[in-house]
Amino acid sequence: MDKNSTIIVLGTAHRMREPGKCSPDGRVKECVYSREIVSEVAAKLKALGYKAEVDFTDLDLPKSMQSPSVTLERNRELGMRVNFVNELCRQNGAKNVLYVSVHLNAAGADGKWHDAKGWQVHVSTTASQSSKLLANCLFDAAKSNGLKIRQPSFMQKYWPQSLYVLGNTKCPAVLTENLFQDNKDDVDYLLSEAGRHAIARLHVEGIMKYIEKA
């Protein structure tokens, strides 16, 4: 890909009004942590001369889009994200856009600590080869930055999953799960200076490597 014509879209995680999505002790809120990391990654990429956009920076939808129905509000949020990415694809050509949605994982939704830990990357069940290449580049960057890696098999680095933002965006798209917000060790690392730097750095390095290879 041509660095000068590539649009990198970084996706933030969820909303403050989305139930759960935090560590059992409340130290980590996924929507807040994700936005902090995305902001840092975008700033680093821009400083290196890349074009970076963020799909949704606010912590909640505008009042006019909020709803008593959790499902309806979530669907509105996801639709807004997909529309943002696809409009950039329409304006710039889908081959010149890539999408990386930055999340935290969870083993349960019960407010308890769990044993599962580590980093993983997801692609759509109908992912293109470009999406798989992007996932592989991020996987390699996570591994080189010392993160414990989770993969479905020794031969495959990415997890196929039916996720709305991956299946409905027109460009190469992946979703990263950056450790578990319900694992004590992972939370401690996420909140450490070294952990924050590693999470941000792996995204910068992985995206740069993909643009170089694609």
Each model region followed by its residue ranges:
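Catalytic-core regions of hydrolytic enzymes
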Residues: 2-119, 125-129
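Active-site-adjacent mobile loop/cap segments within catalytic or ligand-binding domains
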Residues: 6-9, 20-22, 108, 149-214
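Short, low-complexity, polar/charged sequence segments that are solvent-exposed and flexible
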Residues: 28-29, 119-126, 139-143, 193-197
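Solvent-exposed, polar/charged alpha-helical surfaces in well-ordered, non-transmembrane soluble domains
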Residues: 31-39, 43-47, 83, 132, ...
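Non-catalytic surface loops within mature trypsin-like serine protease
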Residues: 104, 125, 140, 180-182
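Active-site-adjacent substrate-binding region
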Residues: 130-158
